[in-house]
Amino acid sequence: MPQFVHLHVHTQYSILDGQASVQRLVDKAMADGQPGIAVTDHGDMFGIKEFYNYVQKVKGKCKDKAAEAEARIAALRDGTETCADPAAEIAKCERQLEECRRKLAFKPIIGCEVYVARRRLHDKEGKPDQSGYHLILLAKNLKGYHNLCLLYTSPEPTRLGMISY
């Protein structure tokens, strides 16, 4: 199966639109073998810290498990550890190691879904201006993340988190 990455996912932080918890989304994506996932909540970035921290926590646990599996494989191969079926134990440890490597390669993609006015920000003339367009923005690197943060924390008085209807 080709690798697949969701680039537009809402968490419980997308008010009235998302229900999934960050932990369950990450766990499911990793279990499905996805190499990453992008959290793009509606009009906010409230879940980004929890998302990034949870991925790092899972990766930290995997580093420890991978080190244990590598040590066990080495011990079984050189004979310092014995068991009834060393070949089966080595195969089991190699599967655990492969799963850990896959999780360690998982990429948390940081983004948001912004609202774009159809005409101009302050135009509110009936049906055409009742809803705006949605635009997905993804951070390519740390500078992109900082730019997203600036977009959402701008002190400009005309900046709105969501278009009012």
Model-derived regions, located:
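Phosphodiester-processing cores and adjacent nucleic acid-binding clamps
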Residues: M1-S154, R159
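Hydrophobic alpha-helical segments, chiefly the membrane-spanning helices
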Residues: I163-Y165
